[in-house]
């Protein structure tokens, strides 16, 4: 007797509301949305429920501005997704699922200089403080994601700006800190963790 193949992960899905605490008009997303105002008809997003998958939300349309990682769960107001970010955003206007969010198979290499030059560190685990693990600089010049998906933070303790790093975007290669996102004005990365799947 043969057994049926194990089912794959459920498709990514999340529901958005235009008011806090899951009130007001709502819109459900199953794929990338460059502008929730146009596609979903919501004037703003004030609460989010992630049913499946992991998502990255952006404060502006077209995947621009501050990034916020949204893992499975409820986000009843902006403080739930901003957390201890140095930049609080009370609006989210574009969304996309995170690719390759396999927590068990994640590898990233940090480089001191641009274009994968200088000292390097290979990581396969979460690090709440890169300086305490021996990374001599507060900055990371470039990085390569070999597998999985990661979220890097500006400060130790998973605080500050968030940068979502995926193997299947940019081929996993970020040659300069400017490729981390439109809000990346510095290469300061001091903590990093694997994305929860």
UniProtKB/Swiss-Prot annotation:
Ranges for region N-terminal arm:
1-11
Keywords for the protein's UniProt record, in alphabetical order: Cataract, Disease variant, Eye lens protein, Repeat
What's the domain remark here?
Has a two-domain beta-structure, folded into four very similar Greek key motifs.
The record's annotation in SUPFAM superfamilies points to:
gamma-Crystallin-like
Query: Hey, which family's this protein in?
Result: Belongs to the beta/gamma-crystallin family.
Q: Which organism is it from?
A: Homo sapiens
Q: Which GO terms describe its biological process?
A: lens development in camera-type eye; visual perception
Molecular function (GO) terms for this protein are: identical protein binding; structural constituent of eye lens
Quote the subunit structure annotation.
Homo/heterodimer, or complexes of higher-order. The structure of beta-crystallin oligomers seems to be stabilized through interactions between the N-terminal arms.
- The gene that this protein is the product of is CRYBA2
- Tied to what disorder? Cataract 42: An opacification of the crystalline lens of the eye that frequently results in visual impairment or blindness. Opacities vary in morphology, are often confined to a portion of the lens, and may be static or progressive. In general, the more posteriorly located and dense an opacity, the greater the impact on visual function.
Q: What does this protein do?
A: Crystallins are the dominant structural components of the vertebrate eye lens.
* Beta/gamma crystallin 'Greek key' domain segment(s): 12-52, 53-99, 106-147, 148-196
Question: What name goes with this protein?
Answer: Beta-crystallin A2
InterPro entries for this protein: Beta/Gamma-Crystallin (IPR050252), Beta/gamma_crystallin (IPR001064), G_crystallin-like (IPR011024)
